[in-house]
Amino acid sequence: MRLPAQLLGLLMLWIPGSSADIVMTQTPLSLSVTPGQPASISCKSSQSLLHSDGKTYLYWYLQKPGQSPQLLIYEVSSRFSGVPDRFSGSGSGTDFTLKISRVEAEDVGVYYCMQGIHLP
């Protein structure tokens, strides 16, 4: 498992003057969900995140109030240790989705998608 060394920015990683400029765009920017209902967040990359090693380096993090970001999903769809199975990731190339099958109160926070294919 390849984990990024650092989390850079909220929705965007930008390397000025580089041919590897990648813009990550999440939608929606905010979401109100009733507990027990499903939720979905989309993430679009300006470039394919498929690496020559065959893996796609897309990560999802959750930052709960007053806490550091915690890894939920790595390589598009693999749940990190201890992450409940109500969280799932899908997608390929440039389009990705994080789904929560049944939202719980503890799921409140800021969700981030992050690419790990081009790091400074």
Swiss-Prot record:
InterPro entries: Ig-like_dom (IPR007110), Ig-like_dom_sf (IPR036179), Ig-like_fold (IPR013783), Ig_V-set (IPR013106), IgV_Light_Chain (IPR050150). Residues 60-74 are annotated as: Framework-2. Residues 75-81 are annotated as: Complementarity-determining-2. Residues 82-113 are annotated as: Framework-3. Residues 21-120 form the Ig-like domain. Residues 1-20 form the signal peptide. Pfam families: V-set. SUPFAM superfamilies: Immunoglobulin. It is found in: Secreted; Cell membrane. Residues 21-43 are annotated as: Framework-1. Disulfide bonds join C43-C113. GO terms for biological process: adaptive immune response; immune response. Residues 44-59 are annotated as: Complementarity-determining-1. Its main location: secreted. GO terms for cellular component: extracellular region; immunoglobulin complex; plasma membrane. Residues 114-120 are annotated as: Complementarity-determining-3. It comes from the Eukaryota. V region of the variable domain of immunoglobulin light chains that participates in the antigen recognition. Immunoglobulins, also known as antibodies, are membrane-bound or secreted glycoproteins produced by B lymphocytes. In the recognition phase of humoral immunity, the membrane-bound immunoglobulins serve as receptors which, upon binding of a specific antigen, trigger the clonal expansion and differentiation of B lymphocytes into immunoglobulins-secreting plasma cells. Immunoglobulins are composed of two identical heavy chains and two identical light chains; disulfide-linked. This is Immunoglobulin kappa variable 2-29. It comes from Homo sapiens (Human). The lineage of its organism: Eukaryota, Metazoa, Chordata, Craniata, Vertebrata.
